[in-house]
Structures are given as C-alpha cells and as structure tokens.
C-alpha cells in the first residue's frame, strides 16, 4: 500500500512539472510579408557591390526579388462554425446588394493605369544698357585759357556699357502603360497603401517599373483600376539594367570633363 502511494505521488509530480514546461501558444500575425519597409521605392540596389564597375558607372542597379518589394501573403482566417439551423442562408458568405468588389484589405490586388505627362517651359531675356558722359570746358583767367605748357584745364569722359542675354529651357515627359500592385497597409481613415513592381527580361538586360503610394477606395473604378494621377505621394520608377542602360549613359571620363570644364 505504501509503495502504491509513493508511485502515485511521483506520477503526480512528473505530471505537474510537465504542465509547467508547456509554452503558451504563439500568436502569429494575420499577414506574412517579406519586409517591414513600406516606403522604399529604390529598395536594395544590388546583392553585392561589384566594386570598380559600379564606381565607374556611378550607378548601382536594382535587382529582382528585392526583399523591400516582396509580395505579401495574407494568412487564411480561422473558420467559425455555427450550429446547423437547416437554413440555406450563410451569413459569412453573404454580401450587400449595394456593395462592390473593390479592394479593401491587405493583400488585395489593384491595377494602376499609368498616364503621366508633364511639360515645362521657361525663358528669360535680359538687356542692360548704361551710358555716362562727363565734360568740362577749359578754365579761363582774365579772358584767356589757363594752360600749363600746351595743355589746358579741360576734360571729356564717355562710358558706354551694354549687356544682352537670353535663356530658354523646355522639358517634357510622358509615360503610359499599366502595372498591378498589392495593398500592403490599410490606414485608419480607410485609405490604402499600395506597392508593386514589374520586371521585363530582355535579351541584353532587364526593364522594371516600380510604384508605391496611397489611394482612396472611392477613386477605384468599377473594373478594379485606378489612374496614376489619383495616387497620393506617388513614386514611380521606370528604368533598366544591363548593356542597353549602360550605353545610354556617358562614361566616367566624359562626366569628369563635363564637370571640370
């Protein structure tokens, strides 16, 4: 009997010690994203600095798969089971007849129509003209000119300065196309923070478009598109990498002489 009591006591101690070692469940976020950097249009330029090549080009190319631009993956919400009532109506899957399918949550997708066009012109003209004349008649004493040798006391000065200059500058830019981005954050006022990129691989290099900004759900059209001029704090980057991009830029010697001269 005593041995049985000792066995029960030891079993109880082992059970209590095992319960104390159990860790509480770890709460995971509803959204898994590759980065916490929200506003980073440039992102990480390259995986590793290529040294002399980047120094001579004075440019570091971005790379595809940048963690700052990684897509986010919302986790599935747990299902809530309700007692069966025999009704065919399911409140969880119901929607209002006045509601639409606009993106309103993290991970939703929206297409941005790029239609950017800017034009600036400036001209300036300047004309300056300054003219001075000064003279003095010969001094006369007793009706005769006062002289020293062959020179009298008189002078005549004239000064004429002119300056003329003109300058003109014209610049225009345009961009058209589309890019599909994701909602990465929902602000307290209901506005949506969007971010996304598109990479096109060519024979001798890559081209990419990156876009981020803040939009209003009311500005989204019925076909789930929004114009780029409706984006607040928009950052749009369109460029390329590789040989074609290198050929469009002057070399480091040309840049050096352009600056020094």
Swiss-Prot record:
UniProt keyword annotations, A-Z: Bacterial flagellum, Cell outer membrane, Lipoprotein, Membrane, Palmitate, Signal
Family annotation (Pfam families): FlgH
Protein's UniProt keywords contain Nucleus: no
Membrane topology: Lipid-anchor
Subunit structure: The basal body constitutes a major portion of the flagellar organelle and consists of four rings (L,P,S, and M) mounted on a central rod.
Family membership: Belongs to the FlgH family.
Protein name: Flagellar L-ring protein
Organism: Vibrio cholerae serotype O1 (strain ATCC 39541 / Classical Ogawa 395 / O395)
Gene name of the record: flgH
